[in-house]
């Protein structure tokens, strides 16, 4: 049984919905308190699932809230859902983030020529099991894509759950194409077109959309972990609304174990209904698989 569990507050598909990660029953920060590396060799990493595969609610670790619960993103006070771009439905992987990482907006990457997007590092977990919001999965890194999102570098790390049946066969990005043909191409297309139904242009990529290999990806992860260390210890100025509060990080600027007791109790509430228009399929010209 995992030492990590979840505490849900409010109903899914409402503004009140929050998912806290707990360790041994005590709320912790989903961004700061979960170790990035799950083993001493740094070959297995922890990821936090934000959005289970095939779902549409844009759930994400909230950088501004105490202990960084996962909430649904909003725009102009309304909940945000990703659109279904044919032939995809929702997110096509378990989508989440690496804890203890930060894409530093003060650093321009020498190869992408763009600064970081000020978020934890995004992760696409490609295993067969659907995850759940707040789940902490142990994964291994396979590769990385560099999305250029409105002038910022937005890395997308490709990983697989170490417990997946295919995990022993997948050790680098070329193994993904061998054993899961079409997935990398579909991933590239998904990120390229997913904003088009909302009236935005298609996204572009560094490296002409190439998915870089495991070694390159592991270096990106290491750099973003170091950027987080600078952030949590006060060596990098955090945005004024970031919450760096944690219960376990030695040397951090905001360590406060007592804060766990202030988190609301769990609530078992049924999901709220969503507008049927959320489920519409959009057909994007020029996006053949």
From Swiss-Prot:
Q: Which reaction does it catalyse?
A: diphosphate + H2O = 2 phosphate + H(+)
Pfam families attached here? Pyrophosphatase
- Provide GO CC annotations from the record: cytosol; nucleus
Gene Ontology biological process terms from the UniProt entry: phosphate-containing compound metabolic process
Per UniProt, what is one GO molecular function of this protein? magnesium ion binding
Q: Give the main EC class.
A: hydrolase
Q: Where does Mg(2+) 1 bind?
A: 117, 122, 154
Entry-linked CDD domains: pyrophosphatase
Residues bound to Mg(2+) 2 are: 122
Highest taxon of the lineage: Eukaryota
Q: Identify the EC number(s).
A: 3.6.1.1
Q: Which UniProt keywords apply?
A: Cytoplasm, Hydrolase, Magnesium, Metal-binding
Q: Which residues bind diphosphate?
A: 80
As cofactor, the record names: Mg(2+)
Q: What is its main location?
A: cytoplasm
**SUPFAM superfamilies from the entry?**
Inorganic pyrophosphatase (SSF50324)
Localization, UniProt: Cytoplasm
The annotated subunit structure for this chain is: Homodimer.
- PANTHER family of this UniProt entry? INORGANIC PYROPHOSPHATASE (PTHR10286)
Similarity annotation: Belongs to the PPase family.
Q: Can you say what this protein is called?
A: Inorganic pyrophosphatase
Give the species: Schizosaccharomyces pombe (strain 972 / ATCC 24843)
Please name the gene that encodes this protein: ppa1
């Amino acid at each position: 049984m995992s030492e990590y569990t979840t505490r849900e507050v409010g109903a899914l598909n409402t503004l009140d919905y929050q998912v806290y990660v707990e360790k041994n029953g005590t709320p912790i920060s989903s961004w700061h308190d979960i170790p990035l590396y799950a083993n001493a060799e740094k070959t297995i990493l922890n990821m936090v699932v934000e959005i289970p595969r095939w779902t549409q609610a844009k759930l994400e670790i909230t950088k501004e809230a105490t202990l960084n619960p996962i909430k649904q993103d909003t725009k102009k006070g309304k909940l945000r859902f990703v659109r279904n771009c044919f032939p995809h439905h929702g997110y096509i992987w378990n989508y989440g983030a690496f804890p203890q990482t930060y894409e530093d907006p003060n650093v321009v990457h020498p190869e992408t020529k763009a600064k970081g997007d000020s978020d934890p590092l995004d992760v696409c977990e490609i295993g067969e099991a659907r995850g759940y919001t707040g789940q902490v999965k142990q994964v291994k890194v396979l590769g990385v894509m560099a999305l250029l999102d409105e002038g910022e570098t937005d890395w997308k790390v490709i990983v697989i759950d170490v417990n997946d049946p295919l995990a022993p066969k997948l050790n680098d990005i070329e193994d993904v194409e061998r054993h899961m043909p079409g997935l990398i191409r579909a991933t590239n297309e998904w990120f390229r077109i997913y904003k088009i139904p909302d009236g935005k242009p298609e996204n572009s990529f560094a490296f002409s959309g190439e998915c870089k290999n495991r070694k390159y990806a592991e270096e990106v992860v290491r750099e973003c972990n170091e950027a987080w260390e600078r952030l949590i210890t006060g060596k990098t100025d955090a945005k004024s609304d970031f919450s760096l509060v944690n219960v376990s990080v030695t040397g951090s600027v905001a360590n406060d174990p007592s804060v766990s007791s202030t988190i609301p109790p769990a609530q078992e509430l049924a999901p709220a209904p969503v507008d049927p228009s959320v489920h519409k399929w959009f057909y994007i010209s020029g996006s053949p698989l």
